[in-house]
Amino acid sequence: MFKATTILAYKGKNGSIIGGDGQVTFGNTVLKGTATKIRKIGKDGKVLAGFAGSTTDAFNLFDMFEKCLESAKNDLLKAAVDFSKEWRKDKYLRKLEAMMLVLDREHIFLLSGVGDVVEPDDGKIAAIGSGGNYALSAARALDKFGNLNEEELVKESLKIASEICIYTNNHIKTYAIWDNK
C-alpha cells in the first residue's frame, strides 16, 4: 500500500524541515522519479505537510486538512484533532490509502490511514512511507551524533533511505520554516 515514497519531518533548534523523495511506483514499475509529495500549507506557509500512499487519496486528505487548518486559524494541534474526527466519521475517508506528516515550529504529527494522530515520543522526528523506518533511523543517529543543520540532516537521512529502499530514490525535495528568515 505505501510502497511509493519516503517522507521525513524534523523539528530542530532553528527550523522545521520536511523532505521527500521523488519516486512514484506502480507495482514493480517506476512511473516517475521527480514527483513532489510535500507542501507548505496554511496561512503564510507556516505548516509543512507530506504524504505517502495513493496520490489521489493523499490530495483529498491534503484538501481536507487545509480546510481544518483554516477553520482552526492555523492552530496545528486543533486542526489535527479536528481532521482526525472528520476522518473517523466519514465512511469514504476511512478507506483512503494514505498517511500524512504535518509539522510547524511547535508540533509534529503523523496522521495515520485510520484517522489516528500520533506525536512522536521525541517530539521532533517522524517518517512515513516504504523507506520511513530507514530515514527515521538515520535521522535519529545524525541528530544524536552528527553536526548537521536541519536541512542537511533531512537530506542525508533520505539519501540513506534511498540506498536501502527500492521504492525510494535520491531526487530529494525539502521545504523549511526557519525561526529568523
From Swiss-Prot:
Allosterically activated by HslU binding. PROSITE patterns: PROTEASOME_BETA_2. This is ATP-dependent protease subunit HslV. Na(+) binds at residues 162, 165, 168. Belongs to the peptidase T1B family. HslV subfamily. Coiled coil: none annotated. GO terms for cellular component: HslUV protease complex; proteasome core complex. GO terms for biological process: proteolysis involved in protein catabolic process. It catalyses: ATP-dependent cleavage of peptide bonds with broad specificity. Its EC number is 3.4.25.2. Pfam families: Proteasome. The lineage of its organism: Bacteria, Pseudomonadati, Campylobacterota, Epsilonproteobacteria, Campylobacterales. GO terms for molecular function: metal ion binding; threonine-type endopeptidase activity. It comes from Campylobacter hominis (strain ATCC BAA-381 / DSM 21671 / CCUG 45161 / LMG 19568 / NCTC 13146 / CH001A). A double ring-shaped homohexamer of HslV is capped on each side by a ring-shaped HslU homohexamer. The assembly of the HslU/HslV complex is dependent on binding of ATP. Keywords: Allosteric enzyme, Cytoplasm, Hydrolase, Metal-binding, Protease, Sodium, Threonine protease. InterPro entries: ATP-dep_Prtase_HsIV_su, Ntn_hydrolases_N, Proteasome_sua/b, Proteasome_suB-type.
